Amino acid sequence: MNTLNKTLLSVSVALGLNACANVQTAKTYDLDFSKQKYTEQSIEVNGQAVKFRAYENVVYVRNPVDTRYEIINIYVPEAYYNGGEIDGFTAETAPIFLPNQIGGYMPAEPGKPALESKRGEPEDGQKSPNAALTALSKGYVVASPGARGRTESTGKAPAAIVDLKAAVRYLKANDKAMPGDAEKIISNGTSAGGAMSALLGATADQKDYENHLKALGAAEGSDKVFAVSAYCPITDLDHADMAYEWQFNGVNDYKKMNISMLDYRVKRE
């Protein structure tokens, strides 16, 4: 093969790869909430059936980088579609519980309401409602966003907080189209997720993120939340590293431990 043909082949391959990359990211999404795309679900909590509509895997930006994570699961108590009330809340007044599943600043898919085994107990033992299911049973609308994270090339900072802000903007943009009061969004997370939840509250409408949000095609408007629920938020990473060094000083033996991504069950192998 002569030099010209080799050059043409290289250019063709490069163009082909570029075209494939564009196919993966070229699709744009509508940010209007679709009321008809749901499933009806019911889970028993304390002897009572908690019935709700599940709107899952909803892309919350027009130009997502990764649709594995830039999606949100929305759950609405069925009573709100029949003019009902739960603990004094209605379709117009119900707060929106926004729990993220972020751990270790890694990518996180949206969460779901479920009955789960308590930490340290066997899988076949007694199960309790998780936070999302508990919130539903109390009349909250639940919206659990996914977010990109540090183990992916597309998840470097500030990707995670930008994704959470975009999810909040999606809910506010669709406030009139869905049950729940988007002025009463309560963000929730644990550990790194708690840190991201705290950051979401502290950086409300911060202009430094605007270009990132525009690049994703996030809905315009505010990303302010009403309240933050942050469990053991790990925010001061430099001092945390020093604390680990102090705590484990002189500990030189290591045994591998596997920790599952969402339920943090420790398994020594």
Model feature map: region roles:
Residues 1-9:
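Bacterial N-terminal signal peptides that target proteins for export
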Residues 18-19:
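C-terminal motif of bacterial Sec signal peptides marking the signal peptidase cleavage site
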Residues 23-90:
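Catalytic-loop region of hydrolases
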Residues 92-96, 138-143, 182-184, 223-227:
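Loop/turn elements at helix/coil->beta-strand transitions in domains of secreted/extracellular proteins
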Residues 99-162, 203:
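Cap/lid segment of the alpha/beta-hydrolase catalytic domain
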Residues 155-177:
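Alpha/beta-hydrolase active-site loop
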Residues 173-250:
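Primarily recognizes the serine-hydrolase "nucleophile elbow" in alpha/beta-hydrolase
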